[in-house]
Every structure is written in C-alpha cells, then in structure tokens.
C-alpha cells in the first residue's frame, strides 16, 4: 500500500472548476482519495474583495462563501471520483442543496481554512457529501452538501 499523497495545485484545480477570480475559493488540494475524501485549503487575505463591505471595521468572511468554498472542494472530489485524469468535456457539478449548515466561529483575514469533505453516497449523478471547515484545528463550519452532475453544451 502506498502512502503517496494525491495533491492538486492551482493549475490543476483550474482544469476542474469553472470558477475564476474572484469566485475561485480553493487554493490547493492537500490530499484526496477518489470516492472517499478530499482535503483542501483556502488562504484568507485582507485583499479579498468581499472584505470591502463585510465589514470594513471588523472584516469577517461571509458564511455563504465558506460554504461555497466547501462546495467547490466537494466538486473536486466528485470529479476525481468520476475520473482521476482530466475532467470529461461537457460535464459540470452543480451545487444542488445543503442541509444542517452550522457556523461556530468567524473567519478573519490571515486565517487559513482547511476543508475536509467526505463522500457519503452517489446515485444517478447526485452526490451527497459531509464537509467541515477548520481554522487552527477548530471547526468553523460544517454542512451536508449535495451536488448534481450535468452535461452542458459547449
């Protein structure tokens, strides 16, 4: 059994996710096991565009963007489960639903968010995942996320 880590740098992430600045919220994948789990990070900088209005005096990363980043990590795991090489042309994973989202503390500039997403099940192109976002080992957000695989015209 190999202890080799499966990682993804930003160049590879860009091949899988359609998101671009300012909405690409995953900086690196630290490890993944197709069909099982994926760990990724987001470095939170004061230069993030959302900090201009949320909130100028006490900058806090919006919770919906923490969930969006978690959903992007989920999409990467779904793609890597489907095909470990390159993403198939004309296929996207859409955010289909969320349950039991909980926020436990704020995320501020200078934090590094570690995402850990686990695949619970997949059936007929609908995947169900559980994710946690942590800063310094402390859970800041957790949720069950659903995504749907769809063919798109190119």
Curated annotation (Swiss-Prot):
The cellular location(s) given in this protein's UniProt record come to: Cytoplasm
InterPro entries to which the protein is assigned, alphabetical? FabA_FabZ, FabZ, HotDog_dom_sf
Q: Might you give the EC number(s) for this enzyme? A: 4.2.1.59
Its recorded reaction(s) are: a (3R)-hydroxyacyl-[ACP] = a (2E)-enoyl-[ACP] + H2O
Q: Does the keyword Cytoplasm apply?
A: yes
Gene3D superfamilies from the xrefs?
Hotdog Thioesterase (3.10.129.10)
The SS bond pairs are none
Keywords tagged on the record: Cytoplasm, Lipid A biosynthesis, Lipid biosynthesis, Lipid metabolism, Lyase
Question: Active-site residues?
Answer: 54
Q: Which GO terms describe its molecular function?
A: (3R)-hydroxyacyl-[acyl-carrier-protein] dehydratase activity
- Gene Ontology biological process terms from the UniProt entry: fatty acid biosynthetic process; lipid A biosynthetic process
Question: Gene Ontology cellular component?
Answer: cytoplasm; membrane
Q: What does this protein do?
A: Involved in unsaturated fatty acids biosynthesis. Catalyzes the dehydration of short chain beta-hydroxyacyl-ACPs and long chain saturated and unsaturated beta-hydroxyacyl-ACPs.
Q: What protein family is recorded? A: Belongs to the thioester dehydratase family. FabZ subfamily.
Name by which UniProt lists this protein:
3-hydroxyacyl-[acyl-carrier-protein] dehydratase FabZ
Supply the source organism for this entry.
Shewanella baltica (strain OS155 / ATCC BAA-1091)
């Amino acid at each position: 059994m190999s202890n080799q880590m499966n990682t993804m740098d930003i160049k590879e992430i860009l091949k899988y996710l359609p998101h671009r600045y300012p909405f690409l919220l995953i900086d690196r994948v630290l490890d993944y096991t197709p069909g099982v789990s994926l760990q990724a990070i987001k470095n939170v900088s004061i230069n993030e565009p959302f900090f201009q209005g949320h909130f100028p005096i006490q900058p806090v990363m919006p919770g919906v963007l923490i969930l969006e980043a978690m959903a992007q990590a989920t999409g990467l795991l779904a793609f890597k489960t489907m095909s470990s090489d390159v993403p198939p042309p004309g296929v996207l994973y859409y955010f289909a639903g969320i349950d039991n989202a909980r926020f436990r503390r704020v995320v501020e500039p200078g934090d590094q968010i570690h995402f850990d997403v686990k695949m619970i099940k997949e059936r007929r192109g609908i995947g169900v995942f559980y994710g946690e976002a942590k800063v310094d080992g402390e859970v800041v957000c957790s949720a069950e996320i659903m995504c749907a695989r769809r063919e798109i015209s190119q």
